[in-house]
């Protein structure tokens, strides 16, 4: 009997050993080939993902990049991230190469967790779904279309400050910034303006956003499991809104051009077919994520830096009050007013340089190619990092110094300032983000000055930068 159990144990150990060997062999086989970039591949499945993520959790995501640039004396290096063989392209030359070769040598890539959270994309892929969205969005997000949204956005901003900021001594900025940008997205994408209706989505939506780019382990208690549950709840609510909008369009109670939702319901593909409800719900869900998450981070860091730099605040205040004093009582901001906010936008750009809401993004090599003398195999994932240029001494003198004058005149050199990406895949919502950020700034500074309550509050990047405690501030209302 003892011999039997000993034999069984040996078989189990041998089986596990063989599996581990095969896993290690498969992992290393992804990194074989002539003249690959220098770098370390780490352990199977894990690779260097924990180091990559932990530098963000500690508030310094650029450390992962700059440490390896220094170690390998190269602006391109190999690694393994999110279970995939990868190369990191750092610097303006790497940005230019990736942005200029979209759909030629590379195309967009998202972790598998994205396809699992958005089930309609599994019929094609999240890449194909993104292409469809980029065809739908331009007419709603181009400057001509955004002009008519300016007054609406100012109206919502005024309501937001009246509800959440006025008559308060202290506030926590980050959750309020998320509430504002989410309210805007709901209003402009789906014509939902009632705060109670917006609030119904708010909590599950933040659960979804925080668990979207995580290790895709669907077990109770994991961020990914919570994200799937939240997405199912939101999708159910969205489908109810879609069904009602169909009825309203049929009965002429809704306009064909009032928002993105109406356009999606009426749009057809090359074969004349309409999108199904699930596909529309997933697209709206994706838009809500892209339409508010990054802007709320940028707004929060604007508040942070203006609290720390009173001379910057005073210049922004002067510019915004000149605009405010030119308006009649009760008159909303218009497009021309926003175009006058030049210094304010330079400040916002400097904030996004130092704390880019979009830390970077992945591409996938669709063919073998050579960059900087190194071979990049087909199928490898390629990561570009905003911080690799934003905080580079070569691209920005005194990179740690807050200096909005960097954006005067011609501004930074091409491919060095990339908070919205670049090339064909530059964020289509760039102008929309500019509007919501500037309108928030206008309504904030004309009401308050403020102080940080936690002078040394830690910054976390996961995946966007955010203050660990949400940036609590003490408000000082301006005297009438």
UniProtKB/Swiss-Prot annotation:
EC number, UniProt record: 1.14.14.126
Main localization category: membrane
One cellular component term from this protein's GO annotations in UniProt: membrane
Keyword set, alphabetical order: Heme, Iron, Membrane, Metal-binding, Monooxygenase, Oxidoreductase, Transmembrane, Transmembrane helix
Tissue: Expressed in leaves, stems and fruit skin.
InterPro entries: Cyt_P450, Cyt_P450_CS, Cyt_P450_E_grp-I, Cyt_P450_sf
Enzyme class, UniProt record, top EC level: oxidoreductase
Sites where the protein binds heme: 427
Subcellular location: Membrane
Necessary cofactors: heme
Topology class, membrane: Single-pass membrane protein
Transmembrane segments: 3-23
Single Gene Ontology MF annotation: heme binding
Any one of the GO BP annotations: saponin biosynthetic process
Catalysed reactions listed for this entry: beta-amyrin + 3 reduced [NADPH--hemoprotein reductase] + 3 O2 = oleanolate + 3 oxidized [NADPH--hemoprotein reductase] + 4 H2O + 4 H(+)
The organism's place on the tree of life at top rank: Eukaryota
SUPFAM superfamilies in alphabetical order: Cytochrome P450
Chain's role: May be involved in saponin biosynthesis in fruit skin.
Family classification: Belongs to the cytochrome P450 family.
Protein name: Beta-amyrin 28-monooxygenase
Gene name in the database record: CYP716A17
